């Protein structure tokens, strides 16, 4: 109990003098004996979140650097081009280059090749000129067939063999002359008929055109007659065979004359 003069009571606890009235009011009374009073929870010292004012989060400003001319840059200089809109006023920035475009380097003068007029003419002639008788690409020429008489009648090695060559020559020489005469006469007639048909004036009517066409067909039939073609081929074969026999006989005779002759 407090006295009106404000001094403490002598019956009071000496330790209670240090407590304030607010602390004494907060302390719960001690539980009575025989009664289990429910424990009161101590109010939290924290204030509700609603009492705090929401403050915006501080934003971190980008570092500012000074360029070579003393101007402030909001972004540090990097390998890429400066961003548009962040460059200081009064400073012009070049347009960004695409990464695939090569940087312009020093101009290199190309060496010029001097070509004379005669060289151009020679190159043009070489390109236009083709070898005569050249084998086309991919074409395999057929081997030239060797006549059978060249294999059947080798060079003469004895007098007996020479006599056999002479007999064959004389036997087929008469046949050759006969065939040559027949084939020659037929070829002469065909040449005359062809010249006559070529000299005829153009037909004036349909009948004349039909006659001329019939004569030309007969001319082609005679020239392509199988009997005439066989005689012509036989005559050509005998001519080559007789020439080969004559050459082999002459070589043997020339060799015998050179061996039997004596030089002083």
UniProtKB/Swiss-Prot annotation:
PROSITE patterns: OCEL
Residue numbers spanned by region Disordered: 1-112
Biased composition annotated in UniProt, kind: Pro residues: 96-105
The OCEL domain, residue ranges: 147-257
Polar residues compositional bias, start-end: 1-10
GO cellular component: apical plasma membrane; bicellular tight junction; cytoplasmic vesicle
Pfam families membership: Occludin_ELL (PF07303)
Stated name of the protein: Occludin/ELL domain-containing protein 1
Protein species of origin: Homo sapiens
Taxonomic lineage of the native organism: Eukaryota, Metazoa, Chordata, Craniata, Vertebrata
Gene: OCEL1
């Amino acid at each position: 109990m407090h006295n009106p003069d404000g001094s403490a009571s002598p019956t009071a606890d000496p330790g209670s003098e240090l407590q304030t009235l607010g602390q004494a009011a907060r302390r719960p009374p001690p539980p009575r004996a025989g009664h289990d009073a429910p424990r009161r929870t101590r109010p939290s010292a924290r204030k509700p979140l609603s009492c705090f004012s929401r403050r915006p989060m501080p934003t971190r400003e980008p570092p500012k650097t000074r360029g070579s001319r003393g101007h402030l840059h909001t972004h540090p200089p990097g390998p890429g081009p400066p961003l548009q809109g962040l460059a200081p006023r009064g400073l012009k920035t070049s347009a960004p280059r695409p990464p695939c475009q090569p940087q312009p380097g020093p101009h290199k003068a190309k060496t010029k090749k001097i070509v004379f007029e005669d060289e151009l003419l020679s190159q043009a002639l070489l390109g236009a000129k083709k070898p005569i008788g050249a084998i086309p690409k991919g074409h395999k020429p057929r081997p030239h067939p060797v006549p059978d008489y060249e294999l059947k009648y080798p060079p003469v090695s004895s007098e007996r063999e020479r006599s056999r060559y002479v007999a064959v020559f004389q036997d087929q020489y008469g046949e050759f002359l006969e065939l040559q005469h027949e084939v020659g006469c037929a070829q002469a007639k065909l040449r005359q008929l062809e010249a006559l048909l070529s000299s005829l004036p153009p037909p004036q009517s349909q009948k004349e055109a039909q006659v001329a066409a019939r004569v030309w067909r007969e001319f082609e039939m005679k020239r392509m007659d199988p009997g005439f073609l066989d005689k012509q081929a036989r005559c050509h074969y005998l001519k080559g065979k007789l020439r080969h026999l004559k050459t082999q006989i002459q070589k043997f005779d020339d060799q015998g004359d050179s061996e039997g002759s004596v030089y002083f």
